[in-house]
């Protein structure tokens, strides 16, 4: 018998039937072509996995009877906010997808000086919604049951004035390497765009309590740097191990 895993924004309760939301129903019915009796693992972001069976499946609505639930054990022990400068093409999308797989807690798209993307407020909102769907898909694939929030794009100066974290790190390929010491309760990780943050932005970050972090002698692309940084932090303080 086939089994699938899907996100639904609807409330989920054991021994109750749930009509899945439009996104989940469309994917299950039209892409995966589920049938009555197929097993599903459903999550809604509350940290639990809900198991059940499809009781009805039409082109527009899939319903599932939830029969059991258990807490997910896939969340990182680190509370990490990734502030990543927006980049052109699909590089930003790829980066946030992989960051989700690596356990990031939240994502903030940053509009720094060297970000070469100009959109209207309406298009930025659509971008934010699209990025959130990418994160949801990454959670479905990776087994996560808590969905990282993708914030509205914001300027670097605004984010720096608002962010709160025990450990604040900004990537800088010119920084002096230093060791990571005691495990923090929360981390804010700032990564610039192609070409890096402007010198004035690095200075502003340091003035707001950030420490420079260097990831080795090579210059990493803007979509590669988050993966390396999150892997280093996860191996040092989190649940990434060999």
Protein language model annotation of sequence segments:
Residues 3, 73-79, 180-183:
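N-terminal small/glycine-rich loop or linker at the start of catalytic domains
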Residues 199-242:
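Structured adenosyl-cofactor binding patch, chiefly the S-adenosyl-L-methionine
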Residues 163-203, 210-213:
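Active-site/ligand-binding-proximal alpha/beta "capping" segment
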Residues 1-71:
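N-terminal positively charged helical leader segments and presequences
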Residues 18-20, 77-81, 186-188, 207-215:
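Glycine/charged-rich beta-loop-alpha catalytic/anionic-binding loops adjacent to active sites
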Residues 67, 73-167:
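RNA substrate-binding interface of SAM-dependent RNA methyltransferases
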């Amino acid at each position: 018998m086939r089994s699938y895993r899907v996100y639904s924004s609807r409330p989920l309760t054991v021994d109750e039937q749930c009509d899945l939301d439009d996104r989940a129903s469309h994917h299950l019915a039209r892409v995966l072509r589920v049938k009555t009796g197929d097993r599903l693992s459903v999550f809604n972001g509350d940290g639990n996995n809900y198991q059940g069976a499809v009781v009805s499946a039409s082109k527009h609505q899939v319903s599932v009877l939830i029969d059991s639930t258990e807490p997910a054990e896939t969340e990182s022990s680190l509370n990490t906010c990734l502030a990543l400068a927006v980049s052109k093409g699909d590089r930003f999308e790829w980066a946030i997808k992989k960051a989700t797989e690596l356990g990031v807690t939240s994502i903030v798209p940053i509009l720094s000086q060297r970000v070469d993307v100009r959109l209207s407020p309406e298009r930025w909102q659509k971008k934010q919604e699209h990025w959130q769907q990418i994160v949801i898909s990454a959670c479905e694939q990776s087994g996560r049951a808590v969905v990282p929030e993708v914030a509205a794009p914001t300027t670097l100066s605004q984010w720096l004035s608002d962010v709160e974290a025990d450990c604040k790190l900004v990537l800088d390929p010119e920084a002096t390497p230093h060791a990571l010491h005691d495990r923090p309760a929360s981390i804010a990780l700032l990564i610039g765009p192609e070409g890096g943050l402007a010198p004035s932005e690095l200075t502003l970050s340091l003035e707001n309590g950030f420490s420079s972090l260097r990831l080795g002698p090579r210059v990493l692309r803007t979509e590669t740097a988050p993966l390396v940084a999150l892997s280093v932090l996860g191996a040092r303080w989190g649940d990434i191990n060999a």
